[in-house]
Design a protein with these regions (language model features):
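Periplasm-facing N-terminal accessory domains of Gram-negative outer-membrane beta-barrel systems
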Residues: 10-103
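Periplasmic N-terminal accessory/gating domains of Gram-negative outer-membrane beta-barrel systems
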Residues: 46, 72, 77-90, 101-226, ...
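Extracytoplasmic loops and strand-loop junctions of Gram-negative outer membrane beta-barrel proteins
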Residues: 121, 183-187, 202-204, 246-249, ...
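Transmembrane beta-barrel architecture of outer-membrane proteins
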Residues: 134, 153, 188, 198, ...
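Short strand-turn segments of transmembrane beta-barrel domains in outer membranes
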Residues: 199-208, 216-221, 229-267, 278-281, ...
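Transmembrane beta-strands of outer-membrane beta-barrel pores
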Residues: 207, 237-243, 282-286, 352-356, ...
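Transmembrane beta-barrel wall of Gram-negative outer-membrane proteins
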Residues: 232, 254-356, 379-398
Length: 445
């Protein structure tokens, strides 16, 4: 089967935050400054004293100032914004002729939520213990999630629903399994995004927002980090193997090893204007084959089968004792943020995830599977996103996003694509599978 499809996205989940509130002086000037990048937005409160800022970067810190003629300027420091939520503040200005030692500050009145949900910040991720640095380890901070399995077998259930009922997005763009071939429901075999590159994860279970839909379990929106005026980064690595796993009911743990390493770096290209953020991560997991030892009475017949296929069809069937190469993944993220002016900014995000996994056809125990019966299960997902966030006027704000996604899954038998599937019964009654996988697909989406 060969399928080719290129996906374009024009609608997506929110990737920004907003600030709203009121001030006791209509017409007062409200200024919001994002300290890490130096970007600012200013607006005058309306006749009712209300103000609103949208399209802001999640996180912070922000500084909010309010000023008006004849009044002392008030300032609120260390404001941190929640992804896809409106953060509310009430500010009281005091006449400049009032007693000097009276101090009045802005008061945070709360967060206007779009429904039941939770937010996981980069600090939460850094402080949470995790075996495989998988998304599920951090989502289970919310008790409405149930997590089963690890690595590529992880299943994330929200409110008791099937894990495929979730909608998972990265920077507002869907990253779900388009074909239903991955047990985890993601568009990748392992983690769909390195958690070291995430700024916040927003989870919604029953939102009343037109921007959130296409799910029956949870809407999980992960937003990546951006560069700031500070050049900073880190190199990291972690690994585990069977010696770090406790016995389950006294049963031995099969041998395995899993290693992850990578780096992240971000900073300014042009101070206060243009910023970059780059992340790279590679993972490798190895588990020895569970091939059974070859019984003495079967070895001669297996060798005879191998020789026959080579002499008659020039087909190399391999051998039943086979250790597949390690399962591997490479992830690359490049993000550029450009502040055109105080009211307009654009983003470009490039993400590429490549998985390679060698699998064998499911079989009953006590059967011999030749190496030619294994197949390569590769996934390559490349995404380019262009976004515009701006204020057209005091009453109109716009967020536009265009995404191009190319998804490839070219499955290929190690024994080649032009030799059919066969099962051979040995004299001992056991089966031998010396030929290619019976299911094969070449998929481009």
């Amino acid at each position: 089967l060969s399928v080719f499809f290129i996906g374009f996205s024009f609608a997506a989940n929110d990737t920004s935050s907003s600030i709203s509130g009121s001030v006791n002086v209509p017409g007062a000037t409200i200024t919001v400054e994002h300290v890490p990048t130096g970007s600012t937005k200013s607006s005058a409160a309306n006749d009712s004293g209300n103000f609103n800022f949208s399209g802001l970067r999640p996180g912070g810190p922000y500084v909010i100032t309010a000023s008006a003629a004849g009044f002392n300027t008030e300032r609120v420091d260390n404001v941190y914004l929640t992804l896809a939520e409106s953060n509310s503040f009430d500010v009281v200005l005091v006449s400049s002729t009032a007693i000097e030692d009276v101090v009045v500050t802005g008061v945070r009145s709360g967060i206007s939520s779009s429904g039941p949900g939770s937010t996981i910040t980069a600090d939460d991720i850094a402080l949470t213990a995790s075996i495989d640095k998988g998304i599920g380890d951090f989502l289970k901070r919310d008790s409405r999630f149930a997590i089963q399995g690890t690595f590529r077998d992880v299943q994330i259930s929200a409110l008791g629903s099937n894990n495929r009922y979730n909608n998972f997005t990265i920077d507002g763009v869907a990253a779900n399994d388009p074909l239903g071939l991955n047990a985890n429901g993601f568009a990748s075999v392992r983690n769909p995004i390195s958690v070291e590159t995430l700024a916040q994860i927003r989870v919604d279970f029953a939102p009343y927002s037109v921007t959130k839909g296409n799910f029956g379990g949870a809407n999980i929106n992960a937003v990546t980090k951006s560069g700031t005026n500070e050049l900073e980064g880190k190199v990291y690595g972690y690994d585990t193997d069977q010696t770090n796993v406790g016995d389950v009911l006294g049963a031995p743990v099969n041998q395995f090893s899993d290693e992850t390493k990578g780096f992240v770096v971000g900073g300014p290209i042009i101070e206060d204007k243009l910023f970059f953020f780059v992340g790279y991560e590679e993972s490798e997991r190895f588990s020895p084959s569970n091939s059974q030892p070859i019984a003495a009475e079967d070895e001669a017949e297996l060798l005879q089968i191998k020789d026959f296929l080579m002499q008659r069809y020039n087909y190399d069937a391999g051998w039943p004792i086979f250790n597949a190469p390690p399962e591997s993944q490479e992830q690359t993220l490049v993000k550029l943020d450009y502040s055109i002016n105080d009211n307009h900014r654009v983003e470009y995000i490039y993400q590429d995830t490549q998985d390679i996994n060698i699998r064998e056809y499911d079989r009953p125990n006590l059967n011999y599977v030749f190496s030619s019966h294994y197949y390569v299960y590769p996934i390559d997902r490349e995404k380019n996103t262009f976004a515009y966030i701006g204020d057209i006027s005091d009453d109109l704000s716009v967020e536009m996003k265009y995404t191009d996604i190319v998804y490839k899954n070219d499955q290929d038998s190690l024994g080649g694509e032009n030799f059919g599937h066969h099962r051979i019964t040995l004299s001992s009654g056991e089966y031998a599978y010396p030929t290619s996988e019976q299911y094969l697909s070449l998929i481009h989406i």
